C-alpha cells in the first residue's frame, strides 16, 4: 500500500523524542483510540524504524504503511487487527 496520511484519524508528532519516548507516546495515544482508527506517527529517531513495527506485532495492531526513506519518518498504525 502506498503511504497515504489522509487515512489517519489522529496524528502524533514525536519528532525530537528519543527512544523509548516515541513508542511510549504511541502506546498512550492508541490506548485512547477506538478499534479501527488510524494513527499517523511522525518521528525522527532512527530506532523507530525497528521499534514501531515491533510494537505493532507485540500489541496486536496493524502497521498499514511506513515511510522511512526521509525525515520525518512516518507510520500509519491501525488500532487492533480487524
Curated annotation (Swiss-Prot):
Localization, UniProt: Cytoplasm
Principal subcellular localisation of the protein: cytoplasm
A GO CC term attached to the entry: cytoplasm
A Pfam family that the UniProt record links to this protein: TusA
Record-annotated membrane-spanning stretches: none
Entry's Gene Ontology BP terms: tRNA wobble position uridine thiolation
Active site residues of this protein: 19 (cysteine persulfide intermediate)
Top-level taxon: Bacteria
Keyword Phosphoprotein annotated: no
InterPro entries from the UniProt entry: Sulphur_carrier_TusA, TusA-like, TusA-like_sf
UniProt-listed PANTHER family: SULFUR CARRIER PROTEIN TUSA (PTHR33279:SF2), SULFUR CARRIER PROTEIN YEDF-RELATED (PTHR33279)
Database matches in NCBIfam families: PRK00299.1
Name the record gives this protein: Sulfur carrier protein TusA
Lineage: Bacteria, Pseudomonadati, Pseudomonadota, Gammaproteobacteria, Vibrionales
Amino acid at each position: 500500500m502506498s503511504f497515504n496520511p489522509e487515512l489517519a484519524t489522529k496524528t502524533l508528532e514525536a519528532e525530537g523524542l528519543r527512544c523509548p519516548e516515541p513508542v511510549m507516546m504511541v502506546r498512550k495515544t492508541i490506548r485512547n483510540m477506538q478499534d479501527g482508527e488510524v494513527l499517523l506517527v511522525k518521528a525522527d529517531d532512527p530506532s523507530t524504524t525497528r521499534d514501531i513495527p515491533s510494537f505493532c506485532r507485540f500489541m496486536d495492531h496493524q502497521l498499514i504503511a511506513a515511510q522511512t526513506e526521509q525525515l520525518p519518518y512516518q507510520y500509519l498504525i491501525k488500532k487492533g487487527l480487524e
